[in-house]
């Protein structure tokens, strides 16, 4: 909560689109925002993206997300995309195609819903990984920066915590999550 306030990520009246895959990181983010929404006074729309890669597992993730949102009385949208096809079409890796598709889907949801923020579940470990990827690619000093906590309408409230803290948080709340096999 202090990190969110420090970076002025959320304010009363915001409409926050939350990327919710069902994995530990996004479930943690969703629960934290759900706890803060009444305290601060903002709305949440969860958006789940099925990448068309993992078949039945992906359908199970989608059901998990829908059930979680119903329990918390948070509206949820689920969008399916054929990422392998998109990757071939645009000559990019599936990872890059997935990132591009998610960004477009989140931004479209925000536009249609009147969203003011898009919350993503990147954490400290992701930030370190990004830094070293940039370093390995030979980025100059300017390109060495990691992930920004606030970038336009995008916010990343978990950048101040690591993966272990996220898992501990979920364990402490006896909250399950999906594991990407």
Task: Indicate where each model-derived feature is located.
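Core alpha/beta nucleotide-donor-binding catalytic domains of modification enzymes
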Residues: 1-20, 24-181
């Amino acid at each position: 909560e202090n990190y969110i306030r420090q970076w002025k990520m959320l304010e009363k009246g915001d409409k926050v689109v939350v990327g919710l895959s069902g994995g530990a990181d996004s479930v943690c983010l969703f629960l934290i925002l759900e706890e803060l929404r009444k305290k601060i006074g903002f709305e949440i729309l969860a958006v789940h993206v099925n990448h068309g890669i993992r078949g039945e597992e992906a359908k199970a993730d989608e059901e998990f997300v829908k059930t979680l949102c119903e329990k918390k009385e948070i509206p949820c949208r689920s969008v399916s995309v054929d990422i392998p096809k998109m990757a071939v079409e645009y000559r990019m890796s599936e990872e890059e195609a997935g990132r591009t598709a998610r960004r477009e889907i989140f931004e479209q949801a925000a536009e249609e819903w009147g969203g003011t923020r898009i919350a993503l579940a990147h954490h400290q470990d992701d930030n370190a990984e990004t830094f070293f990827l940039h370093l390995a690619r030979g980025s100059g000093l300017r390109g060495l920066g990691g992930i920004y906590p606030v970038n336009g309408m995008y916010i990343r409230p978990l950048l101040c915590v690591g993966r272990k803290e996220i898992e501990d948080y979920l364990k402490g709340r006896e909250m399950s999550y999906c594991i990407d096999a």
